[in-house]
Every structure is written in C-alpha cells, then in structure tokens.
Amino acid sequence: MIRNMKVLVIGAGNAGRPAARLLNHLNNRVLVNDVRELHELPLKAQKRIAEMEDEGVMFRFGGHSMEDILWADAVFISPNIPQDAPVRKMVREAGDLVHITTSDIGRTLNELIGLPMVGVAGTDGKTTTTNMIDHILSSRYRTVSFSSLQDSLVIEGLVELVVNGDIDDRDLAVFELPHGTIRMAEGLELSAGVVTNLTPDHMDEFSNYDEYIERNFSIKDLMAPGGVLALCGDDPVISSLLDDLEVENVVYGVGERRTVEFMGRRFMLSQYPGQGLRYRAEGTCRIHLHPECIRDTDSHLQHLRSPQLQET
C-alpha cells in the first residue's frame, strides 16, 4: 500500500475526492489540485471537501502549478482529466513521480474492505436491481448498499466505510456501477455481478457505441475467482458477447425478443430457445458471505441456451 508519501491528486471530482480521502487515511500527505474554483463545483462536492479538509486533506483550486507537482512524491490523475490536458504534460515533464492508478485505489480498497461485494452494471434497471438484491439479502445479512436511490457514489461510499471503521459491522456490500463509476472500480473483486442491458445512453460521453458497450461490460474484469456474473439473455447486445466470456456466468431472461437500433446499426436475436426458459448447463455457485464465517451455498445454476445475435 502507498503510505507516508506526499501525494498530489489532480482533479477534485467524483474520482479524485475518494482517492484523496483514502490516501490521506493511509498516512500520506495529500494535496488535491483542480483547475476549477471551489464555487464552480456542485454543492455536494463542496460539502465533502470541507469534511476532507477537517481530516487533513489540502486543496488548491483555480489551476495547476509546477510547484505543486514538484512537491509531490506521487501523483494520482483522475481518469476524467482529458489525455491532452496541459497538466498531464506538466506531470510528464516533472520526471520521476510514482503514478497511482485507479487500479491501485481499487486494489487497496479491496484489501482493506475484505467483504463480499455484488455489483450491478448496465444501462437501465441498475438502481432497481441493486435495491432488490439489497432488500433480499438484508433480511439475513448486515448489508450496505450504494445506488442512485441513496444518492451515493460507490467508491466514495466504500472509502467512507474504511475511513469510519464501519467494515466490521457489515457482512457484504451491494452497489450500482454506472458507466462513470465503473472506471474507478478497477481493482475491486466482486463475488457476484449483474448486467441488466446495454442499450445506447450517454452517447455524448463516448466516441461510439462500441466504446460504451466496452465500458459497461468491463464489470466482467472485476469478478473474483469463483465469482458469478448474471446476464440478461433477452438483450441482443449482451447475447453477442456470451461466446467470448471467460468468467463463470448465468444467463437469465423471460424469452422476450428485443431489438436494439442505433445510428444505422440494428441488433436482434435471430433465434431464441422456445417459449419460456430453456436451460443449457448446470453448475454450482459458492457464495462466500463473510471472511470469518464462510457459508457455502450449493445451488444448481440453470443457464439459457446462448441465442444467436444478428446485426443487420
């Protein structure tokens, strides 16, 4: 872990703040730099920044300076900072700095939390699915949930658990992984994941639809060894990705034939397995519910036959 260093965090937004707070918790001296003025940030961010200042995190707004970069031993650059931003060139010119990545932050969180985690990705239905899962599991386990319903960012919420020492009071975490947040989740290991659907949305933030799909489907890279990814087989885009999927997965659906159209591209299921559900495989799912009290639940996973995707 990164400890006892002078760390410059570039960007005071939704990626930079939780990274800075975690690094400060690990006994680093942390300075957060942002090109914007404080009053230009959302009120919620301003409130969080005030709390972080009370914890010892330093902030400087209104621009970036070489003096701040040279002060640091290490730097974390928010993934939201454009690749051609002048500050990235300044960092390169500064020379020998330790570069802290989003993956470093995720792995550190993963190690400090030590809880089984369930993540929900996709375009529509993430909040509903997250809260349904939390509602079911909370009847038996001490869960913590982060979603739009709670108006909470998952990485900020997980860092809060670590900083406040609330981990021992929880058995597992359930959270929503929107397209913006999922980049900061790299390094986490999920016991289970869900992808609801992959229809076009927020396309002004992506160069093309394929980039949007890749970002949201990157939840597959967060699965822990033995973890299971649940995927909606009714979605033709998800169905097109099943053959190359290397993680343990279960495909669910109700047999609805759906079509996705975007910018001249049309995705549809060319065939579907009959009425209702047909099953293609049987497996065993082991759910690790707490490091100190592991409960292995064996259940037969019934998978849908992989429908064939046709793009016209």
From Swiss-Prot:
It comes from Methanothermobacter thermautotrophicus (strain ATCC 29096 / DSM 1053 / JCM 10044 / NBRC 100330 / Delta H). One of its GO terms (cellular component) is cytoplasm. Pfam families: Mur_ligase_M. Keywords: ATP-binding, Ligase, Nucleotide-binding. Belongs to the MurCDEF family. PANTHER family: UDP-N-ACETYLMURAMOYLALANINE--D-GLUTAMATE LIGASE. One of its GO terms (biological process) is regulation of cell shape. SUPFAM superfamilies: MurCD N-terminal domain, MurD-like peptide ligases, catalytic domain. Gene3D superfamilies: Mur-like, catalytic domain, NAD(P)-binding Rossmann-like Domain. One of its GO terms (molecular function) is UDP-N-acetylmuramoylalanine-D-glutamate ligase activity. ATP binds at residues 112-118. InterPro entries: Mur-like_cat_sf, Mur_ligase_cen, MurD. This is Uncharacterized protein MTH_531.
